[in-house]
Amino acid sequence: MFQNNPLLAQLKQQIEASKEYVEGVVKTSDKSYGFLECEKNSYFIPPAEMKKVMHGDKVKAVVKRDGDKEQVEIDSLLEPMLERFIAQVRFNKDGKLQLAVDHPSINNFIPANTQKKVTEPLENGDWVVAQLKTHPLRDDRFFFAQVTQFICKADDNFAPWWVTLARHEQPREPVANEKSYELQDQVEREDLTHLYFTTIDSASTKDMDDALYVEPISENGTQTGWRLVVAIADPTAYIPEQSAIEKAARQRCFTNYLPGFNIPMLPRELSDDLCSLVPNEKRPALVGYIETDLSGNVVGEARFVSAWVQSKARLVYDEVSDYLEKVENHWTPDCAETAQQIDWLHQFTLARIDWRSKNALLFKEQGDYSFELAEDGAVKAIHIDYRRIANQMIEEAMIIANICAAQFLDKYAHTGVFNTHSGFDSKNLEPARKFLLDTLANDENRESLSERYSPERLSTLEGYCEMRRDIEQFPENFLEMRLRRYLTFAEFKATSAPHLGLGISHYATWTSPIRKYGDMVNHRLIKQVLSNQTAKPVEETVLARLQEARKQNRMVERDIADWLYARYLEPMVEQNVEFDGEIQDVSRGGLRVKVIENGASVFVPFSTLHNNKEEMLFSPEEIALYIKGEKAYQIGQAVKVKLKEVRVETRSVVGDVLI
């Protein structure tokens, strides 16, 4: 009777048209209800509806109103929070397999089975990779998952490493070795084994990929400059372009340096032995000859050759720094030739630092945090390491070598893997200009600074460098940290473009081919030019993978560090330990404070800062918190914090600001 009834169809259309649909992301609470966070509003999700969804699901819902109360009824799934995910195994009282998702806001226990290829017997707490197979909104069934990969046992002390690598789909083993390695040389190598090359690395370094030789250039008995000879290990001499090793390196893109150990991009036989520039061993290398005047300015064009080299001495950063800084009871070079190389490289470095301070941009010293681990992976201590003079000596040599390689590739290959950075994001040029003027301008200089910081000028290499030098004199970190928010990301490009972050017009790395795939690509291109071949254009897929891998490696490093910090700090909560810190971020939820002593990130909820929410105002433009109309906390501000709670299972560290 009602079938094909036009009036009924019209009624259905009217009812559907009267519904108010919204789209948003599900957010759970510590109760059975939740919220749908939409672009402009937040809607209550009742407990019955929450059973259909999971935290993070993107859904479409219908708004229901009862007087002035609003809630939503879930309509459909737009995008699930979970597809592939990390979880811990749990067996319920009936012995049924369930999975506890490794996410701080997902408390569901998901029923699961195990893929046949997973042969390890599972126990409570074991770490696994799983795939969500069914979703109530998509499949008209309850949540159900399947274990697809075993990661490690519950009591494995190295779980932070293995779980994080699995989360980001990164390998945990080196590339498999070949039975043998043969040279693939197409050009004859020059014999440079007579030059007194030295390496400077950390004491534990095995993959030594750069060695240096430096000498003064003289005219009529007067020194006029420096000749730097940069020898870089040449793994492409052993790796055919279509080999399995090449393909693996192209996928990995970088050696992954993790707390306690690394996972090399190449087989260890290549990275740590056959290609490593160990002392007194003849090694194939790509060598660049670079000449400067006494002011550190590059003179002429760099020359590149394929060569044989032999490192004469393996030096260590701290020992060389102690020697040059005349630290008490310092190490001393064991021969005059080594001492001479250290002295000359030191003089060359000072000239280059001075040149870069005037013509490019210097790095602001921040210090690097490193974990000292016991054999079982426990954190014994956390150290902050600053770049000392020996580190700067290698840094300056590598920077000038990369500048010269970029110029060479641009001129002769017309392609390459170029490191570029365009400074401020184009959409942030006007906000950056406004912030600079609000912070630095006064009645006397406003007109000149307005022109100096115009969007057009800030987007140029010269204008950006001027601005950076202007703010160097300001001790307040908030200036630097605020400006950082307006920057775009560095990019790999196949054609040369400026790197504003370095203040340099051309930059392409080739000095770490054992550790970076982009450097391997640049090696091949330089060697193609040297052998009079047409250089093959760098594929966009290579650049995209480099960009993606760099991001993945940073996330891996961050996630492992967060886990280790939680382990390290947990025992300190009961000790009421206080730390000096610096506010790194201000968000709607609270402050993010970096502990200066060890680099840990501590979250301070807004609710602990003031007892009246109505008197607090968060300013996203200023990245600041106002209390009773006065700015109380802002990015870059020094504060003292005390640990309040550490949850290792969610890697969260919560603290209080001490007034």
Swiss-Prot record:
Which domain of life does this protein belong to?
Answer: Bacteria
> Which is a Gene Ontology cellular component entry for this protein?
cytosol
Q: GO biological process: any one?
A: mRNA catabolic process
Name all S1 motif domain ranges: 576-658
Give the EC class as a word.
Answer: hydrolase
Keywords for this entry?
Cytoplasm, Exonuclease, Hydrolase, Nuclease, RNA-binding
Q: Its Gene Ontology molecular function terms?
A: exoribonuclease II activity; RNA binding
- The residue ranges of the RNB domain are 189-532
KW Zinc-finger (keyword) present: no
Signal peptide extent: none
Where in or outside the cell it occurs: the entry states: Cytoplasm
Where's it mainly located? cytoplasm
Q: Which family does it belong to?
A: Belongs to the RNR ribonuclease family. RNase II subfamily.
PANTHER family per the UniProt record, alphabetical: EXORIBONUCLEASE 2 (PTHR23355:SF37), RIBONUCLEASE (PTHR23355)
Q: What is this protein called?
A: Exoribonuclease 2
Q: Which organism is it from?
A: Glaesserella parasuis serovar 5 (strain SH0165) (Haemophilus parasuis)
- Which gene underlies this protein? rnb
